[in-house]
């Protein structure tokens, strides 16, 4: 198996190692990641889109994508890739260490379960069992029983099963089980669910403005209010979450100053470029009209 895996890795490279007499004839290719010129024996071509990068950069990119991607498909690192290529598992296994590839497979499986409406995870922290979910109407809660710990919970909110109460009206709290304790949405709970995708998030310390790594939703840790559009962090100036951001007043003011500076800079750029666009617009319109007129004459049969 070791020799087969090594043979597969070698076939992924763009060329074989050149002989010493052919070094002067070896072409150099520019890597789109590090912008350095490398010989073909140090490059790797992706199978799906045929984009080529140096092997060292591709290894670093894959390891970073595995750690930050939560099991999502690893796409071609070229932002303007015309084929929108995706790396195959054989390529990933060839270029990253074994433990990194095992982590990728585990995260990929967890993501598949999360996106599958017929499967869900047991909410008990140390159970980690995949439970089957009966088919139902979209958004309709279904009773789910874990085959391992036999916990009965709701398929939508993952709280204890509430037959006569909706998920919104149910009171989430501590779920005692023989395996441990699952925290709900109390203010001091260390584990809460994302208000959008319901993924469990643990907060140890630091800022109270949270961003879900799964759906990128930004919310307040204490009251779960939506903060996607609160760029000035005004939520923590009033109400029950006043002064609970977790940062000093000076750092908050500095953050607001930076945001204002960025907005003012964009406004200045717009003001400076708008007269130039107005002056250049007649030339642009003339060029477009000339091009359209030329195409019309080309396709007009009376001119032939």
Swiss-Prot record:
Residue sites binding Zn(2+) 5 per the record: 220, 223, 235, 241
GO annotation, cellular component aspect: cytoplasm; mitochondrial membrane; ubiquitin ligase complex
Pathway: Protein modification; protein ubiquitination
Transmembrane intervals: 259-279
Amino-acid positions noted as binding Zn(2+) 2 in the UniProt annotation, renumbered to this chain: 122, 127, 146, 149
Zn finger region (RING-type): 31-81, 194-223
Residues annotated for Zn(2+) 4 binding in this entry: 194, 197, 212, 215
Gene3D superfamilies membership: 1.20.120.1750, Zinc/RING finger domain, C3HC4 (zinc finger)
Superkingdom, taxonomy of origin: Eukaryota
UniProt catalytic activity: [E2 ubiquitin-conjugating enzyme]-S-ubiquitinyl-L-cysteine + [acceptor protein]-L-lysine = [E2 ubiquitin-conjugating enzyme]-L-cysteine + [acceptor protein]-N(6)-ubiquitinyl-L-lysine
One matching Pfam family: IBR
Keywords from the named record: Apoptosis, Cytoplasm, Membrane, Metal-binding, Mitochondrion, Repeat, Transferase, Transmembrane, Transmembrane helix, Ubl conjugation, Ubl conjugation pathway, Zinc, Zinc-finger
Subcellular location: Mitochondrion membrane; Cytoplasm
Membrane topology category: Single-pass membrane protein
Region (TRIAD supradomain): 27-245
Residue sites binding Zn(2+) 3 per the record: 154, 157, 162, 167
ZnF bounds (IBR-type): 102-167
Residue numbers annotated as active site: 207
EC number(s) per entry: 2.3.2.31
Function: E3 ubiquitin-protein ligase which accepts ubiquitin from E2 ubiquitin-conjugating enzymes UBE2L3 and UBE2L6 in the form of a thioester and then directly transfers the ubiquitin to targeted substrates such as LCMT2, thereby promoting their degradation. Induces apoptosis via a p53/TP53-dependent but caspase-independent mechanism. Plays a crucial role in maintaining the genomic stability by controlling the degradation of multiple proteins involved in mitotic progression and DNA damage. Regulates epithelial homeostasis by mediating degradation of CDKN1A and isoform 2 of TP63.
Description of its domains: The RING-type zinc finger domain mediates binding to an E2 ubiquitin-conjugating enzyme. The transmembrane domain is essential for translocation to the mitochondria upon induction of apoptosis.
Assembly behavior: Interacts with UBE2L3, UBE2L6 and LCMT2, as well as with BAX. Interacts with TBK1; this interaction inhibits TBK1 phosphorylation and 'Lys-63'-linked polyubiquitination.
Family, similarity comment: Belongs to the RBR family. RNF144 subfamily.
Name of the protein this chain belongs to: E3 ubiquitin-protein ligase RNF144B
Gene: RNF144B
